[in-house]
Amino acid sequence: SCLLLQFTDKRFQPVHDLTIGVEFGARGAAGALLVYDITRRTASNVEEAFINTAKEIYEK
């Protein structure tokens, strides 16, 4: 939600509501977007987990 707000309105909102049920809105999506901090070493571990999760969702 905050990322979308940044891209659409070019503003940051430090306090936000949780995006409950986002997995339901993602059903039938044609793509996915992975955003992470490449300056952090632990961020590289995110890629494999993201791909595995995306595959699981796609196969349902």
Swiss-Prot record:
Annotated protein name in UniProt: Ras-related protein Rab-2A
Reaction equations catalysed: GTP + H2O = GDP + phosphate + H(+)
Localization per Swiss-Prot or TrEMBL: Endoplasmic reticulum-Golgi intermediate compartment membrane; Melanosome; Endoplasmic reticulum membrane; Golgi apparatus membrane
GO BP terms: autophagosome-lysosome fusion; Golgi organization; protein transport
Top enzyme class: hydrolase
Residue numbers covered by motif Effector region: 16-24
GO CC list: acrosomal vesicle; autophagosome membrane; endoplasmic reticulum membrane; endoplasmic reticulum-Golgi intermediate compartment membrane; Golgi membrane; melanosome
The enzyme's E.C. designation: 3.6.5.2
GN (gene name): RAB2A
Membrane topology field: Lipid-anchor
Family, per entry: Belongs to the small GTPase superfamily. Rab family.
Keywords: Cytoplasmic vesicle, Endoplasmic reticulum, ER-Golgi transport, Golgi apparatus, GTP-binding, Hydrolase, Lipoprotein, Magnesium, Membrane, Metal-binding, Nucleotide-binding, Protein transport, Transport
